[in-house]
Amino acid sequence: SVSKPNVIFVLLDGARWDRLHTSNDFQEISKEGTLLNNVTTAMPYTVGSLNVTFSGLYGKDNGVDAYYNVLKLKEEITNLPIIFKKEGYFTACDLLHEKILANRGFDIHQSHDEFSDDLEIKHKNLIKQCLEKANGKPLFLFLYFSRLHTITVSDVLKKYEWNDKRFYNKKDENLKRYDNGFKEVGKYMRGLLYSLKKLKIYDDSIIIFFSDHGTGVGERFGERNYGSFTYEETIRTFYLFISKDFKKGRISEKLRDTIDIFPTVLDLAKINNNLRRPGDSFAEFLLGNNNELKEKNYTFSETGALHGLYPSPDKSNVFCIKTPTQKLMYLDSPKQWKFFDLINDPNEMENKYGSDLGTEKKLQKILNEFINNR
């Protein structure tokens, strides 16, 4: 029988799709695989986002549907760690804190200290430890690289209240700080791949570098980093898939969403998936059997902020539907609609709501169904 591939998810917490070019390391590494850089996260904050990726279900369906519901993953949900463990994998994760992913399906479930741990070393040691304990079983790993979080969240929230104009007035400086942090991300990625090659498991592995959400640098008043709104800088994420079987050096900007990752990964690992899930696999594209990535007609994202103009940590109150060219946003607290032309106004500066009634009505109907069906 063909031996099963290791599956290694590596979260680059808070990494922006539009700043990938600032790291030479990232640019070099992306030549080793296929990059999707227009994947809508169903929720632009870590716990919500990860639980969608790992369960293949929207937050409204998996139980983790708000900041305060981080521990509410429904008992009956079968997610990737549970499936891979059942398939004979040795499973492990290293998290920013242990509540981020439920301790279900993991042989090793540990967390790190973002301020004192050297994650390149810590993760290399975890992989070695897993190889020793696995007794020849393949590995399913989730590694969480939190350095950007420390720089853009932990340091910023300590310094500025949500309505501190000083923060929003220095976007350039904030962006520079972000970009410097992202260079550290690239360096970590390079070190990790070097370790996998040295441990002789690179060739037998599917490696997925991804972001859970982007990070604002002061573009929107009331959002110091992410989780308050559903603009592109926080909901548009990327996934870089690396394996000797995947097409190399390809970049796709086609619209996909995070519910598609679950069926894709199961297909790549040749695991029969008879679970009913809303996502669509794009494994054939990664394997080079399809030249074009099929685009989604629309994707959804939702959030409810911890602080800011419209805090709502116990249920989502900001929603959007995004097509390849447009976005309709609904803010429930002020009962406000926004409509953006993503082609001519990629930074979403001009609310065009009311300018294209036919399209708006059609998208409103679909978005309302998504909002009300919970």
Q: What would you call each of these model-derived segments?
A:
Residues 1-374:
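Catalytic domains that recognize anionic headgroups
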